[in-house]
């Protein structure tokens, strides 16, 4: 590609910086408060929705990597889905 911009082929591409920042946040917190999500969205020039989806995807990836999940963590995830 010639122009470097967000490739809108149905899938969001994140810059290396954005990915690193999101990974760093995820390392400390797998779940974001709405306030924190807004802060991150502003600092990374992303939408809240993008942050939310990135974290959802990241948690799914994390789950696959950590098959041995305690039931307490699973119930916390269910609570978040219904709190939408």
UniProtKB/Swiss-Prot annotation:
Annotated GO CC locations: nucleus
Pfam families with a match to the protein in the record: Homeodomain
Function noted in UniProt: Sequence-specific transcription factor which is part of a developmental regulatory system that provides cells with specific positional identities on the anterior-posterior axis.
Location of the protein in the cell: Nucleus
Source species, domain of life: Eukaryota
Alphabetized GO MF terms: DNA binding; DNA-binding transcription factor activity, RNA polymerase II-specific
Name of this protein: Homeobox protein Hox-B6
Cysteine disulfide links: none
Keyword vocabulary terms for this entry: Developmental protein, DNA-binding, Homeobox, Nucleus, Transcription, Transcription regulation
Gene3D superfamilies the UniProt entry points to: Homeodomain-like
Keyword Membrane: no
Protein family per UniProt: Belongs to the Antp homeobox family.
Main location: nucleus
Gene giving rise to this polypeptide: HOXB6
PROSITE patterns: HOMEOBOX_1, HOMEOBOX_2
Residue range(s) of DNA binding per entry: 7-66
Organism: Gallus gallus (Chicken)
